Each structure stands twice: as structure tokens, then as C-alpha cells.
Amino acid sequence: MITQKMKYALKALLELADEARRDSPQALTIEEIATRSGTPKRFLEHILLDLRKAGVVASIRGRSGGYSLLKAPRDVSISELVRRIDGPIAPLPCLSRSAYQPCDDCHDEAACRIRKVFAEVFWSYLVLIDSLTLEDMLAAGNPAAKLLED
């Protein structure tokens, strides 16, 4: 499950991506992003800072400053964003790619039935989420539908 913070990050990125598609895109202020996305302004400052550190958005200072999308939507991986904003996405620490830890109460990972069941579910989830980009989210309809058709 993604956190509310992640949902706010995605809403902000979708607004920035929509703005980038315009004929004359402008940097958006935090206030504009908050209004357009329905996201509380107080959360956006921290979220946009995280996204800037991740190299996804740029911040422009000054009178006509604000935020703009730095990467093309097709280059913004949803799974990387989730990991950046929410942390590891694995259901068990022993399945995590980025934060692997053996389970404290497990003596034999290879024989662990809990791990085996959750590994199958998790790998299916990874196939889907690792293939999704911000561009998929911008597309009309269900972004997962095109993956299921292939």
C-alpha cells in the first residue's frame, strides 16, 4: 500500500507533467501545484524537496520561479518513486532488493513457506510496478490495461 505522501507526490508530478505538455510551459509555484492537485501545501514543500533531490523536478528561484519536471514522463519510474518516497516495497524484509534483511524468526529462508508464498505475489507485483512510468499515468484510462493486453 502506498502512503498518502506518495499519493501527494504522484498528484504533484502529474500536474507538473501536464504543465510540461503545454505550448508554453511555466514553472509552477507550490501554491499552484497545491490548488491544481488538491494537495495540502504544507506537505508539498517536503515532497518537492525529495523529488528535487531525486533529480525528478527542478526548482527555479525568483519572481517567476517554481517547480518544473526535469525528466521526461517516460523516464520517471513509478517503482523508483515509491521506493524514494515510501521506502522498501517488499512485503517481507527478506524479499527486499534495496533493504534486504533476514527475518529475525526465520532459520532457513529456502524452506520458509511464508517467504515462498509472498515471494510469488511480490514478484508478480514487481513485474507490473517496475514497468510503470509517469507517462503511463498520464495516459487516459487504466495504465495497467496495456500491460495486461501484451
From Swiss-Prot:
Family annotation (InterPro entries): TR_Rrf2-type_CS (IPR030489), Tscrpt_reg_Rrf2 (IPR000944), WH-like_DNA-bd_sf (IPR036388), WH_DNA-bd_sf (IPR036390)
GO MF term set: DNA binding; DNA-binding transcription factor activity
GO cellular component: cytosol
Record Pfam families: Rrf2
Keyword ATP-binding on entry: no
Alphabetic keyword roster: DNA-binding
Gene3D superfamilies on file: Winged helix-like DNA-binding domain superfamily/Winged helix DNA-binding domain
Domain HTH rrf2-type stretches: 1-139
Cystine pairs: none
Official protein name in the record: Putative HTH-type transcriptional regulator rrf2-like
Organism listed in the record: Rhodobacter capsulatus (strain ATCC BAA-309 / NBRC 16581 / SB1003)
